[in-house]
């Protein structure tokens, strides 16, 4: 009895896990095999019709490919900029604490509010960005109504909001590095670039991998900026899986089909991120990490 007593304290957490994760997941799986929508509230079994429709849904698969490209591009830019800013702050610039707080402001802004602000900046007719382009003699750009510029606008917003996260994690990692390797590099006469490439960057690899993985997980759910700024348009040029699932489930009221899309989205996200994590782990081994 005494040996099993500590396990009793796991029961509240286990019940909470069942209530908020396992039961909704099992219920969602059941819903995918039904015809549940706004006109049919019952869970009538229809076999794999929803899954077959999903396989033929080119719009859904296109949104997945778009998300894959968008998430990797934005996270890569965030990492490079975040690392550069972290190195800048790490070197002991004046008013480091002030700049540290200032750089965190975008991340602390509510995503929907941030997207509204950026939408006003990118607006073609009265937006501040086109006004600036006109002042310097350049032609205005249709940021939100053309495919290419719209994707660039979404990328800018995502980078602006989440680069501070990379900065925060990487700066914490830099501040935790031991000083001895840098002292040894200085004694050997290593240049600043050599010290970074041979000492700083390899020692930061585990922290970098962790930060990138966290951001990839979060970037796989891009929704606020897309839905607020472009509604997935023009056409479907900026539509992500989350935006498409939202439309099919809560605007078209096709609950069962939306659940099917969401479940496949979850499966693919888990598989992709697991593979990426294993690749990162394998790449880090030759460096002795």
Task: Kindly give the residue locations of the regions a language model identified.
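A structural signal for multi-pass alpha-helical bundles of membrane permease subunits
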Residues: 2-289
